């Protein structure tokens, strides 16, 4: 069994946040041997209906490839890819040590895995195993099993099906070659005022304002990530 362990003692270790589609990655806040994600978070609309919906991207880690200069400056040296931990996450056990203050509303924190196969990027959220965020440190353990009933496939918004789609869970789990993320899902997107068009065709906070009071706010501190693979 090979184990990945990130304690953030020497920096973000490859973990980062996200600004938006146009501007890409951003550094996470740093605490004492921790990384911190704090609201307001961007509304990820890439999977708007007919996809699975909207989410906030709190923490991200690339699982393969060679990051460029900007990515390295944002996220530090990626200890996952440097350590050669591989992209097969089938039945991997993830243990997270975290805490925070979160006005989560009807969302929960979940693991999201993404892989690109035959030109299609597929995301699966482990919605059957929510990750609890409490005000005191706790360890949360989840298992990336192959039972599709535990997962939700993200699919694609109406105009991104050239890139996003659906590949079987077992295929993606066996080669999570894009990234893993911790996300808040699902978001309640409420347009502020009348719209001239379909809210799912238009892009929230880019094409129209939304009621931020309907969205999560707060912060999450991540102290340790352990991934055990068989």
Located regions from the model:
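Beta-rich carbohydrate-recognition modules and glycan-binding surfaces
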Residues: 1-230
């Amino acid at each position: 069994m090979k184990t990945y362990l990130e304690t953030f003692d020497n920096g973000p270790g490859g973990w980062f946040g996200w600004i938006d589609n146009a501007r890409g990655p951003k550094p996470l806040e740093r605490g004492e041997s921790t990384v911190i994600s704090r609201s307001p978070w961007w509304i990820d609309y890439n999977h708007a209906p007919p996809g699975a919906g909207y989410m906030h991207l709190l923490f991200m880690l690339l699982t393969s490839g060679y990051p460029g200069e900007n990515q390295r400056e944002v996220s530090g040296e990626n200890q996952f890819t440097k350590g050669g931990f591989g992209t097969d996450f089938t039945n991997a056990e993830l243990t997270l040590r975290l805490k925070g203050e979160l006005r989560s509303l009807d969302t929960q924190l979940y693991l999201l895995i993404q892989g690109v196969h035959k030109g299609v990027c597929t995301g699966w959220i482990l919605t059957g195993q929510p990750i609890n965020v409490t005000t005191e440190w706790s360890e949360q353990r989840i298992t990336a099993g192959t039972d599709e009933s535990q997962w939700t496939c993200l699919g694609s918004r109406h105009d991104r099906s050239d890139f996003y789609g659906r590949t079987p869970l077992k295929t993606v789990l066996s080669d999570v070659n894009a990234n893993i993320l911790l996300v808040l899902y699902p978001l309640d997107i409420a347009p502020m005022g009348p719209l001239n068009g379909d809210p799912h065709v238009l892009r929230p906070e880019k094409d129209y304002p939304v009621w931020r009071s309907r969205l999560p706010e707060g912060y999450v501190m991540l102290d340790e990530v352990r991934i055990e693979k068989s």
